[in-house]
């Protein structure tokens, strides 16, 4: 039996996001959930789902910036999909899929007594939301997709696999820090080193032996092995179309390799009612650490929630 993955209780990226564990799915595996604000007071909750190997730390700045704009009590739910962050790993690598994660989301919302919500998903998290819309459209009051669409860019999948594999063999802070900064700088050019370090430590930590450890199930890396740079993946437009029953906003980071520009443009053609934004000078995941990038999401939430009229 594989050794359980360890997440340090004092890991800085997660320390400000206390989580409760909800047991969901056929295997009854625990999922970590953080709730900011107050559920059940009539406000439409926001539920945030991170990318492929990411966790709720990617949403910390969104929560920080949204609170004074929406009100401190507005409920924002962050969660770690299974195999990520503080959630349990799935028993088998073959059990990982967007459909399984969507089924878990249904159970999570039921456990939290959430009947409808505005969902925000980055990368793979957005694909989970499309699967959720196909499975339970009544849950979707609105959706925000960030670097997410009906098809992933194979270049991004290969880059992610190569990057994560390269990191696994590095030992010692002296070697790790420059390598992590160099990798992160490709997505966030011009960012100070301290912030590059903070971004890197959202998905990894350095153990007592000086080795970099992932805050996700290493089996997720192996699932990326079949992909090549020149692969042309099949677009699942029927899943994207499942979002048609509710308002939609789409965002793409300028430097992303997860969502091709031509795919984003086709998404805009198919949903002419949807707002679309480009986040300048960033790759994936979107940092959402400035009011300029967060304000469109806040405005979307207000319109969907009925607290502000559409333009």
Which residue stretches match the model-derived regions?
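An N-terminal hydrophobic leader/cap segment in hydrolases
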Residues: 1-22
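A short loop-to-beta-strand scaffold at the N-terminal edge of the catalytic core in hydrolase folds
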Residues: 26-37
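Conserved acidic catalytic loop of the alpha/beta-hydrolase fold
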Residues: 99-117
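Conserved HGGG/HGGXW glycine-rich cap/lid loop of the alpha/beta-hydrolase fold
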Residues: 36-89
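Conserved hydrolase catalytic core segment
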Residues: 115-156
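Conserved alpha/beta-hydrolase catalytic His-Asp/Glu region
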Residues: 171-226
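Conserved serine/cysteine hydrolase catalytic core
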Residues: 207-269
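Catalytic histidine-centered segment of alpha/beta-hydrolase-like enzymes
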Residues: 282-294
